[in-house]
């Protein structure tokens, strides 16, 4: 099998024009990457296909030289995905193929940028757009008329609001004391007078030395010296109580105990149908029983047996029915 393979390889190399020994065992002039397949391919008389070369060209250069790459054009990245529409067929072609079919312009004609390049023919021309239709122009005019009408309505509304505000201010002034005749005669409301200047502040030394209580006393003395102030016909406004005056003599107040005799106070006759009296009586009984029970636990008073024996009611159920086991006595003795 190996001998047959060797013979087959020799026959192939002889037909190509190579010696098998020189191919396999001779030195490699092309380096270690040179293979037998490459050597066979270089010796065969095959037509080599042209390699694709890409060249980047600017749009300005294309516009300046419209007939430069028509004969032997080199493909560029601009041709990738470029679609030419011709004779109802859509296909991807190079610009050179389309230019060869189009008629070449005369040298005397002016260069038109919209029709110089096939690529510009395929791209929609945004500079030379069609004029807007008449219907859109009419619609724009109608919209402008509506906007102007709305602006006029807004202006009238503003004027009405201003009149209403002026009337309200005039009514407020008449209620404050002005006569309605004078307010009706004046078309515009006069500006309000400037506020009176604030009273001069006392010197800082007096403010620091005088306390709040002293100020209150001085004001009281001034009121008493000036005499009674004539009261107005209108209702008198209630004065706001001052807490400093109320709490001023709190430490000097002493309470006195008063003893009341039992004959002075007469018990009120309670109405049996009054719900408030019934609730008060029930609460008195409840809290009296609780107070009595707490006082008994505090004083550790022993209830005499005579009181318990006088009870007529017989308790059916209770702790007296339990049998004594003696555990309570042991617990009491231990404690």
Swiss-Prot record:
Keywords on record: Coiled coil, Mitochondrion, Transit peptide
UniProt key word Coiled coil: yes
Transit peptide: first to last position: 1-48
Coiled coil: 134-170
Stretches the record annotates as Disordered: 219-240
Tissues/organs with expression: Widely expressed in embryonic tissues with higher expression in cartilage and hypertrophic chondrocytes. Specifically expressed in hypertrophic chondrocytes (at protein level).
Pfam families for the chain: Mito_fiss_reg (PF05308)
Record InterPro entries: Mtfr1 (IPR007972)
Any Gene Ontology biological process: aerobic respiration
Chain residue ranges for the region called Necessary and sufficient to promote mitochondrial fission: 182-309
A GO cellular-component term linked to this record: mitochondrion
Subcellular location(s) per record: Mitochondrion
Major subcellular location class: mitochondrion
Role summary: May play a role in mitochondrial aerobic respiration. May also regulate mitochondrial organization and fission.
Family: Belongs to the MTFR1 family.
Entry protein name: Mitochondrial fission regulator 1
Taxonomic source organism: Gallus gallus
Highest classification ranks of the organism: Eukaryota, Metazoa, Chordata, Craniata, Vertebrata
């Amino acid at each position: 099998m190996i001998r047959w393979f060797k013979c087959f390889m020799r026959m192939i190399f002889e037909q190509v024009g190579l010696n098998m020994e020189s191919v396999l065992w001779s030195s490699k002039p092309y380096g270690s990457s040179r293979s037998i397949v490459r050597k066979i391919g270089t010796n065969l008389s095959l037509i080599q296909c042209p390699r694709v070369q890409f060249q980047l060209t600017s749009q300005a250069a294309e516009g300046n030289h419209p007939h430069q790459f028509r004969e032997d054009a080199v493909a560029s990245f601009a041709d990738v995905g470029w679609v030419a529409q011709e004779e109802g067929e859509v296909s991807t072609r190079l610009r050179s193929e389309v230019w060869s079919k189009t008629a070449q312009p005369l040298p005397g004609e002016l260069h038109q940028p919209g029709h110089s390049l096939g690529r510009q023919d395929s791209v929609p021309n945004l500079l030379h757009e069609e004029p807007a239709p008449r219907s859109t122009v009419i619609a724009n005019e109608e919209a402008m008329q509506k906007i102007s009408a709305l602006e006029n309505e807004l202006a009238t509304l503003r004027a009405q609001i201003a009149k209403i505000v002026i009337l309200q201010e005039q009514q407020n002034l008449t209620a404050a004391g002005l006569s309605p005749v004078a307010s009706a005669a004046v078309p515009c409301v006069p500006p309000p007078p400037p506020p009176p200047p604030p009273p001069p502040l006392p010197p800082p030394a007096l403010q620091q030395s005088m306390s709040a209580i002293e100020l209150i006393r001085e004001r009281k003395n001034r009121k008493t010296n000036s005499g009674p102030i004539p009261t107005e016909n209108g209702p008198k406004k209630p004065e706001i109580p001052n807490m400093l005056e109320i709490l001023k003599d709190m430490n000097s107040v002493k309470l006195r105990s008063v003893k009341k005799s039992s004959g002075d106070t007469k018990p009120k006759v309670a109405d049996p149908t009054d719900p408030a009296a019934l609730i008060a009586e029930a609460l008195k009984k409840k809290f009296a029983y609780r107070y009595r029970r707490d006082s008994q636990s505090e004083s550790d008073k022993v209830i005499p047996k005579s009181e318990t024996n006088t009870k007529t009611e017989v308790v059916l159920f209770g702790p007296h029915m339990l049998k004594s086991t003696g555990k309570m006595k042991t617990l009491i003795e231990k404690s």
